Structure formats: structure tokens, C-alpha cells
Amino acid sequence: MNSLLMITACLALIGTVWAKEGYLVSKSTGCKYECFWLGKNEGCDKECKAPNQGGGYGYCHAFACWCENLPESTPTYPIPGKSCGKK
């Protein structure tokens, strides 16, 4: 029983440590989602937790939305081959 508990705890830690994080980015423009209220930010948190993003928590960092616990399929800044505002 103790072994099963330890294995479960280790798997939970591995999932937490290896979760993806980064700046939320627009797939069409390659630009970060902007924000102006630094720290805890309802807008960033809502965007990060949106079903199409799948994140666990979001806040405003350096005037852009930073997301934690993202699935690997969610793109984060920078997107290879896309420069924000440059053609």
C-alpha cells in the first residue's frame, strides 16, 4: 500500500514539474497576448484557462499573459517562423 502511495505521489510531482508554461500567443499574428495590470490578472487567467488553451493559471508578467500548466499542444511565444508585427 505504501509503495502504491509513493508511486502516485511521484507521478503527480512529475506532471507538475514538467508542465509547459510560457507567454500565450496569437496563432495568426505570432504576437503575445498583451495586458497592463501586472500580477494577478483576471483577463490573462481567463484566456489561459479557455478550453482552446487548456492552461491551469494565468497572470500578467512584463505586460503579456503568462500561462502555467499548459498542454504541449498549446503554442507559446515565440512561434517559429512568425515574427510579431513583421512581414
UniProtKB/Swiss-Prot annotation:
Keywords per UniProt: Amidation, Disulfide bond, Ion channel impairing toxin, Neurotoxin, Secreted, Signal, Toxin, Voltage-gated sodium channel impairing toxin
GO biological process: defense response
Record keyword Cytoplasm present: no
Annotated compartments: Secreted
Domain LCN-type CS-alpha/beta: 20-85
Signal peptide limits: 1-19
Gene3D superfamilies cross-referenced by the UniProt entry: Knottin, scorpion toxin-like
A GO term from the CC aspect: extracellular region
Main location: secreted
A Pfam family that the UniProt record links to this protein: Toxin_3
Distribution of this protein across tissues and organs: Expressed by the venom gland.
Similarity comment: family membership: Belongs to the long (4 C-C) scorpion toxin superfamily. Sodium channel inhibitor family. Beta subfamily.
Official protein name in the record: Neurotoxin Cex2
Source organism (scientific name): Centruroides exilicauda
